[in-house]
C-alpha cells in the first residue's frame, strides 16, 4: 500500500535516495580530507623532529637576533655621537652628554636584569660550561633570562664602553636552542632528550652564538668546543657546521639588505698583500707578540679576579654597594666616562673612537710612523696627537683600556670580555709592528727581494694571541682569519697563539674558569698528564662513607627526619638499613611529595569525617566546639605570622628552602603541628574547615604522629632504578673520565651490591687539586695508607716466594 502511495505521489522516494547518496558522498569527502589532513600533520610532525629543521630554524632566529642587536647598537652609538657633536663648542654640555648618555643606558640595563632575571648578568659562558658538564643551574635557560639578556646586552652595547658581545650572545643562543627544542618536542609529541643530547643541543647553540656574532662559522664550532666542552661528540660536528654556516650567511645577508655592507665580506675587511704575506725574518717579532700577549692575558685575568674578590669582601663600601645595587655600575660608568672624555684626558689615548672603529683603524694598511699628514687617514687620525709620539699614544691606550676593560666587565650587566681583549691585543700587535717599521724603514731583504713591513698584520696577530691567552683557546686564530679574510697569516697566528697559551696557562686559569672558581660553581678540573700521583688514588680513598639513605621500610617520620637533617637533592634507596643493598635513587622533590600527600589538611578531611561518624558527635557539640576552635586557630595563626617554624610538612618546606636549624620549641606541644600552618599557608582552611573544626588540637597532633609511624608505600613515586655505580677500586683517572663523558654530578660506590659510599664532583675536585702545605701537594690520607698496606703485602709475597725457592 505504501509502495503504491509512493508511486502515486511521484518522486519523493527517488529524492530521498538522492539525498542519502549526497550525504554519503559528503561524508566520504570529509573522511578523505581528514585522512589527508592527518597524513600531512604526521608528515609535518615528523619533519619538525628532524635535526636539520631544528638547526635551520635556530640559525635563522639567532642571525635575526644578532643582526637586530648590532643594528640597534650601531644606531645608538650614532645617536650618541650626534648628540655630542650637537653641543660642540660648549665643554660643559659636551661633558654632560658624554657622561649621562652611557650612565642612563648602563643603569637601565642593570635595573632591567635585576628585575626580570638576575641570572642574565655577566658573560654566561662559565655557567654554560658547568651546565654542559652535568650541573643543574636553575633559571639560566629560561625565557625570562633570554629577554633580560637580549635587552640588557643591546642597551649596554649602545653605551660605547669596552664591553663585549660574544659571551652573552653564546648564552642567548643556548637559551634559544633549549626553548626551541622544547617547542618542537611539544609539537611533535616526543619526549625531551636525555642529558647527553641536551648537552649536544647546548654545544650547537654555543657554536651558532659565535658564528652569527662574528660571521665565522668554522671558528664558531671550534671555539665552542674548546671553551665549553671537555669532550665533544663527533656526531655534533655536522650540526654545528650546518647551523653555523646558515646563521652566518643570514647574518651577513641582513647586513647587505640594510646596506651596511656592499656584499658578503668579512666583518673587518683587510687588504694585506697576498702573494708573500710575511717573511721568515718576521717570525721572531710574531713570537715576541705571542709571549707578551701570554703575560698580559694572565695579568688581565688576575686583575679581573682581584676586582671581583675585593667587591665580595665584607667592608663598609661593599655593604653599601650590596644594599644599593645601582651604585656600583653608576660609579664605574661615571669614572670611565670621565676619563674617556675626548676634550679631556681621553684625547691622549684615542677615547673618541668606538670599539669597531678602533679595530678598523688598527687593521689599516698605513704605517703611522711614516705618515706626515694624518688628515687623510679617516678614523686613524684620532691616534695622532700634536706634540705627542704615536708610541706614547698607543701605550697610553693599552694601559688605560687594560684596567678599564677589567673593571667594566665586572658591572652587573650582560657583557663579555672578548672584544675589549681583542682591541688590547690589536694595539699591542700594532705597537710591535710600528716599532719594526721604525727599525727597518726600508723593509726586510730576503733572497734579493724587498718586503715592506705592514703594522696592520701585526695587529691582527696580536688580537688573536691576546684573546687566546685570556680564553685559553687556540681557535681564536681561526676567528681572526675569518674576521679579516686573511687566511694567508694562519702560520704566524698559530705560532703567536700557541706561545701565548703556553705562557698564560702556566700563570693563570682562563677567564671563564676564574669566574667559575670565584662563583664556586660545580666544575671538574682537568687531570693533567704530569699529575702522576693522582693515578694512584682510588674512589675508596675519597668517597663519603657516612651516607644518608632511605630504606624501603622507612616510615613517614623517617622521611621527615631525613629532609630535616640533610640538604641533598637525591637520596640512595636501599632495601633495609641492615643489608643496605642499593635499589635506586629518589629525588628530594619526590620525597617531599610523599609527605605532602600523606600529612596535609586534605588528607585529614576523611580522617576527621570518619572519626566524627565513629564517635557520633551531634550538631550541638560540634557547634559549641566550632567557636572554640576558631579562637584557637586565630591564636595559632597569629603565632605563625610571627615566623615560628612548625613541625610536620612545614618543617619540610623550611628545611628545603632555608637550611637553618629547626626551632628549639618542644615538638610535644600540640600547637606545634604542621596541618594548622598548612591551613593558613596553602588556603585549605576554606575547603576543610567543616571537618577540621571536628578535631581538637590534641587529636590533630595524635593523627599526625600516627601517620608518621606508617610505613611508606614507594610505589606512588618515581625511583631511578639504575643510578650510576662505581666500586671502591676504581681509579681517579677513570672516574674523572666517566664524570666528564656522562656529565655526572654524583655516583654511588657499592661492594657486592651493598652501598658503602658516594662520590660527587666536590670529592673529585678536592682530590685533583689536592691540599697544599709549604709547597708540597699531599695525597688523601687513605691513599697513603693503602699504598703502605700494598707495599707490605707485596713485601710478604716476595719473601714467601724467595723462601719457597
Curated annotation (Swiss-Prot):
Glycosylation (residues): 365
Main location: membrane
Gene3D superfamilies (alphabetical): CBS-domain, Clc chloride channel
Alphabetized UniProt keyword annotations: CBS domain, Chloride, Chloride channel, Glycoprotein, Ion channel, Ion transport, Membrane, Repeat, Transmembrane, Transmembrane helix, Transport, Voltage-gated channel
Motif Selectivity filter part_3 in this chain: 416-420
Region of interest (Disordered), residue spans: 606-625, 653-684
Spans through the membrane: 49-86, 93-116, 141-159, 166-184, 237-256, 283-311, 320-339, 388-408, 416-439, 490-507
SS bond partners: none
Subcellular location: Membrane
GO molecular function: voltage-gated chloride channel activity
Binding annotation for chloride: 123, 418, 512
Membrane topology according to the record: Multi-pass membrane protein
Pfam families listed in its UniProt record: CBS, Voltage_CLC
Sequence motif Selectivity filter part_2, location on chain: 164-168
Intramembrane region(s): 125-132, 201-213, 217-225, 456-470, 471-472, 473-484, 485-489
GO annotations of cellular component type: chloride channel complex; plasma membrane
Note from the entry: The CLC channel family contains both chloride channels and proton-coupled anion transporters that exchange chloride or another anion for protons. The absence of conserved gating glutamate residues is typical for family members that function as channels.
Function (record text): Voltage-gated chloride channel. This channel is thought to ensure the high conductance of the non-innervated membrane of the electrocyte necessary for efficient current generation caused by sodium influx through the acetylcholine receptor at the innervated membrane.
Name of the featured protein: Chloride channel protein
Amino acid at each position: 500500500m505504501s509502495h503504491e502511495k509512493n508511486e502515486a505521489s511521484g518522486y519523493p522516494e527517488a529524492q530521498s535516495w538522492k539525498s542519502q547518496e549526497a550525504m554519503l558522498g559528503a561524508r566520504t569527502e570529509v573522511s578523505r580530507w581528514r585522512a589527508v589532513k592527518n597524513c600531512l600533520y604526521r608528515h609535518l610532525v615528523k619533519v619538525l623532529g628532524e635535526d636539520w629543521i631544528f638547526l635551520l630554524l635556530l640559525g635563522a632566529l639567532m642571525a635575526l637576533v644578532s643582526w637586530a642587536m648590532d643594528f640597534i647598537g650601531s644606531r645608538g652609538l650614532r645617536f650618541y655621537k650626534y648628540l655630542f657633536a650637537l653641543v660642540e663648542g660648549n665643554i660643559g654640555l659636551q661633558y654632560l652628554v658624554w657622561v649621562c648618555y652611557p650612565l642612563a643606558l648602563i643603569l637601565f640595563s642593570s635595573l632591567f636584569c635585576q628585575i626580570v632575571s638576575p641570572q642574565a648578568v655577566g658573560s654566561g659562558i662559565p655557567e654554560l660550561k658547568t651546565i654542559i658538564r652535568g650541573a643543574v643551574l636553575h633559571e639560566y635557560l629560561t625565557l625570562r633570562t633570554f629577554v633580560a639578556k637580549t635587552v640588557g646586552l643591546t642597551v649596554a652595547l649602545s653605551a660605547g664602553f669596552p664591553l663585549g658581545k660574544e659571551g652573552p650572545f653564546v648564552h642567548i643562543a643556548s637559551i634559544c636552542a633549549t626553548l626551541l627544542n622544547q617547542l618542537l618536542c611539544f609539537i611533535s609529541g616526543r619526549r625531551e632528550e636525555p642529558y647527553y643530547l641536551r648537552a649536544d643541543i647546548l654545544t650547537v647553540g654555543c657554536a651558532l652564538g659565535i658564528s652569527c656574532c662574528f660571521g665565522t662559522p668554522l671558528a664558531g664550532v671550534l671555539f665552542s668546543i674548546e671553551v665549553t666542552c671537555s669532550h665533544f661528540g663527533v656526531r655534533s660536528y655536522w650540526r654545528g657546521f650546518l647551523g653555523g654556516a646558515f646563521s652566518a650567511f643570514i647574518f651577513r645577508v641582513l647586513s647587505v639588505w640594510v646596506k651596511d655592507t656592499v656584499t658578503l665580506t668579512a666583518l673587518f675587511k683587510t687588504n694585506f698583500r697576498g702573494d708573500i704575506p710575511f717573511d721568515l725574518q718576521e717570525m721572531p717579532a710574531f713570537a715576541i707578540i705571542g709571549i707578551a700577549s701570554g703575560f698580559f692575558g694572565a695579568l688581565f685575568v688576575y686583575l679581573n679576579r682581584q676586582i671581583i674578590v675585593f667587591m665580595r669582601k665584607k667592608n663598609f663600601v661593599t655593604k653599601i654597594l650590596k644594599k644599593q645595587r645601582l651604585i656600583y655600575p653608576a660609579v664605574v660608568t661615571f669614572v670611565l666616562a670621565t676619563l674617556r672624555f675626548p676634550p679631556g684626558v681621553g684625547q691622549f689615548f684615542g677615547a673618541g673612537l668606538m670599539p669597531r672603529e678602533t679595530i678598523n683603524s688598527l687593521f689599516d694598511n698605513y704605517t703611522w710612523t711614516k705618515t706626515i699628514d694624518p688628515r687623510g687617514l679617516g678614523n686613524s687620525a684620532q691616534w695622532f696627537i700634536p706634540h705627542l709620539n704615536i708610541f706614547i699614544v698607543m701605550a697610553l691606550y693599552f694601559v688605560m683600556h687594560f684596567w678599564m676593560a677589567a673593571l667594566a666587565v665586572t658591572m652587573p650587566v650582560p657583557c663579555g670580555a672578548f672584544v675589549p681583549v681583542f682591541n688590547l691585543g690589536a694595539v699591542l700587535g700594532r705597537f710591535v709592528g710600528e716599532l719594526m717599521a721604525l727599525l727597518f724603514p726600508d723593509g726586510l731583504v730576503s733572497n734579493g727581494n724587498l718586503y715592506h713591513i705592514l703594522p696592520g698584520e701585526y695587529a691582527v696577530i696580536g688580537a688573536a694571541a691576546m684573546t687566546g691567552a685570556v680564553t685559553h683557546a687556540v681557535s681564536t686564530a681561526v676567528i681572526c682569519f675569518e674576521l679579516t679574510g686573511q687566511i694567508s697569516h694562519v702560520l704566524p697566528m698559530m705560532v703567536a697563539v700557541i706561545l701565548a697559551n703556553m705562557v698564560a696557562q702556566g700563570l693563570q686559569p682562563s677567564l671563564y674558569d676564574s669566574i667559575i672558581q670565584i662563583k664556586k660553581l660545580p666544575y671538574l678540573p682537568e687531570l693533567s698528564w704530569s699529575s702522576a700521583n693522582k693515578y694512584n688514588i682510588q674512589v675508596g680513598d675519597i668517597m663519603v662513607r657516612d651516607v644518608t639513605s632511605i630504606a624501603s621500610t622507612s616510615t613517614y617520620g623517617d622521611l621527615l627526619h631525613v629532609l630535616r637533617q640533610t640538604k641533598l637533592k637525591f637520596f640512595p634507596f636501599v632495601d633495609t638499613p641492615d643489608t643496605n643493598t642499593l635499589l635506586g635513587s629518589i629525588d628530594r622533590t619526590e620525597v617531599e611529595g610523599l609527605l605532602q600527600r600523606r600529612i596535609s589538611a586534605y588528607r585529614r578531611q576523611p580522617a576527621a569525617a570518619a572519626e566524627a561518624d565513629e564517635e557520633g558527635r551531634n550538631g550541638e557539640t560540634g557547634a559549641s566546639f566550632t567557636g572554640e576552635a576558631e579562637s584557637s586557630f586565630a591564636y595559632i595563626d597569629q603565632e605563625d605570622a610571627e615566623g615560628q617554624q612548625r613541625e610536620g610538612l612545614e618543617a619540610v618546606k623550611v628545611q628545603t628552602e632555608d637550611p637553618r636549624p629547626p626551632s628549639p620549641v618542644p615538638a610535644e606541644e600540640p600547637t606545634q603541628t604542621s596541618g594548622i600552618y598548612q591551613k593558613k599557608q596553602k588556603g585549605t582552611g576554606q575547603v576543610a574547615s567543616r571537618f577540621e573544626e571536628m578535631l581538637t588540637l590534641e587529636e590533630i597532633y595524635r593523627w599526625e604522629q600516627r601517620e608518621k609511624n606508617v610505613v611508606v608505600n614507594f610505589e606512588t613515586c618515581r625511583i631511578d632504578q639504575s643510578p650510576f655505580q662505581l666500586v671502591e677500586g676504581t681509579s681517579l683517572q677513570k672516574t674523572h673520565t666517566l664524570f666528564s663523558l656522562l656529565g655526572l654530578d654524583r655516583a654511588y660506590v657499592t661492594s657486592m651490591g651493598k652501598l658503602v659510599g658516594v662520590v660527587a664532583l666536590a670529592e673529585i675536585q678536592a682530590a685533583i687539586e689536592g691540599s697544599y702545605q709549604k709547597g708540597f701537594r699531599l695525597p688523601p690520607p687513605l691513599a697513603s695508607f693503602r699504598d703502605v698496606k700494598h707495599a707490605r703485602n707485596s713485601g710478604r709475597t716476595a719473601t714467601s716466594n724467595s723462601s719457597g725457592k
